[in-house]
Amino acid sequence: MKVSRIFLVIFLSGIFWLVIAQFFFCTRFQYKQEASAFQGNIIYNPYANINAANWEKCNFHAHGNAWNGLTNGSGSAADIHRVYDSLNYSVHCVSNYHQIDTVDAAQQNYVSAYEHGFNLMKTHQLVLGGRDVEWLEYLFPQTSNNKQDILNYLSLDTNSLVILNHPALRNGYSDKELSSLTNFNCMEVLSPYGISEKQWDIVLSAGKPVFVVGNDDMHDIYNKEQVGRMATILNLKNTNQASVLSALKKGEGYGIVLGKTQDPFQLPELMHLLVKENKLDLQLSEKARSIDFIGQNGKLLASFSDRKNVQYKLNTSDCYARAKITFENGTQIYLNPVFFTNTTNFAQVQNPINFTETIIFKVIGTLLYAAWLLWAWSFINGGRSSKSNRYEIPTFPDSTFPEFN
């Protein structure tokens, strides 16, 4: 009986510790009450220095068999690389959960990758270029402080790049959190688990230079429907890891969703996007059914039909403008934003630590867990029901009580 109580206490103590660690021991931060839009005297154009001959197709999010089949993924890393090579992808990663695959590490186009997160709400991040896996995680539905704490730890390696994965899935990031969280470089706007266009505009409207990524998020390499449907197109002179991460951080690329009849070997491309005297000049390799310019708070700024070349004048009130391009066969291109700024150093403003709240919550958490351990010790030892602690009611012979007439 006592052995079963011990095992029960150990199990419950572990669960209680996870709760205490997540909601009381996690660092707490101070967040801006209002987001700041893009503003400044400079217009940043991520396509200012591109060469239309240097577009390369990339996929950074794919899962194979890992952890002895415990996670969702079919096929080996070698299978994944072989299939993406056959579809003319210049860069393709295996991004298993909390595991950096090194099968192709000797290849010139190798980029280290892993997906971080095994929590209930699928609040996940993709880490590219990391040397080690970060194991800090919070299992239960996460608070803003939990998410910021994880992003801070993932960003400690300044050579790596952090991407918010499928933010629209299960509301992994709320609208308010997207406005306030920092320390991520890109967003997986294009995913088979949801197009996070609204979420991207929330981030951009908060004045954060976060650039688009499109990925297959493939879990079965043998399923043709999961492969080659979404991609990131980067402008690269070299396909090594340093060049790939640099292009992603500068926004020198775009996301693409392939229509069902789209030839994967003959994709429409951006020829140029020039900015002169606040006027944007966009040129495509083929005519598009529609070209929409979208700005602050997701507002439609302008729309054009049946064109391959368009111009739009960017106003300071627009703050930013990004183009969404749709072709007749359903293929869509999502360009990165052109925006007003005073600097091209895109280091995001950090959310400072709220030391007072952090200390108070840690003290409360410590007291709660200490109280739990005291109760657990009492429970294991039978509580107040043991003979040594039981109160015995004394008995008296009948003669000791007086008789009343």
Regions found by a protein language model. Give the residues of each.
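C-terminal functional module detector
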Residues: 1-51, 221-405
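A metal-dependent hydrolase metal-coordination microenvironment
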Residues: 22-167, 172-174, 180-182, 188-203, ...
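Residue-level detector of solvent-exposed, low-hydrophobicity positions
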Residues: 68, 104, 191, 197, ...
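Short glycine/proline-enriched coil/turn segments at helix->beta-strand junctions
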Residues: 105-109, 158-159, 208, 287-289, ...
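Glycine-enriched alpha-helix->loop->beta-strand junction motifs that scaffold or abut catalytic
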Residues: 181-187, 207-211, 230-231
